[in-house]
Regions:
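Acidic-basic catalytic patches of nuclease active cores, encompassing PD-(D/E)XK
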Residues: 1-28
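Conserved catalytic cores of phosphodiester-cleaving nucleases, focusing on short active-site segments
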Residues: 18, 37-63, 67, 75
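Hydrophobic "anchor" residues on beta-strands that sit immediately upstream
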Residues: 24, 47, 90
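Solvent-exposed beta-strand sheet faces enriched in polar/charged residues
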Residues: 29, 53, 94-96
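Short acidic/glycine-enriched loop/turn segments that link adjacent beta-strands
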Residues: 33-35
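Mid-chain, well-packed structural core segment of small domains
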Residues: 60-91
Length: 123
């Protein structure tokens, strides 16, 4: 799986995961001049800004480590733009780590063993 495919696969898996846990997906890939928020979701009266980090494995580092101070600042500024457009509400920032593992062939094509780690209130 190529890196852009891994990202798309990760975001799709993240949406399925969130919906299965009662989150409503408000939008995907919200963009502002500061950056992009992968998923904007809602649960229990709060907006949840979700950064998805998809990796094939944990060989180098945990995926959430890629959400450092600079990325957090961009996400906060982008969230402020979202609030300016849609109105302020209680909110939090979550990170979803998606590890796709290695592919195995099945009768229906390739299948991936996916592991998901949800970090609520990540920053």
């Amino acid at each position: 799986m190529k890196s852009n495919e891994t990202g798309r696969f990760g975001e799709n898996e993240a949406c399925r995961y969130l919906e299965s846990r009662g989150y409503g997906i408000l939008m995907r890939n919200y963009r502002s001049r500061y950056g992009e928020i992968d998923i904007v979701a809602a649960k229990d009266g709060a907006v949840v800004f979700v950064e998805v980090k998809a990796r094939r494995d944990r060989a180098f580092a945990e995926a959430a480590q890629a959400v450092g101070p600079s990325k957090q600042e961009k996400l906060r500024k982008t969230a402020l733009c979202w609030f300016a457009e849609y109105g302020e509400q209680p909110a939090r920032f979550d990170v979803l780590e998606i590890y796709t593992g290695t592919a195995r062939r099945t009768a229906f094509g390739e299948a991936y063993r996916t592991e998901i780690r949800h970090i609520k209130n990540a920053f």
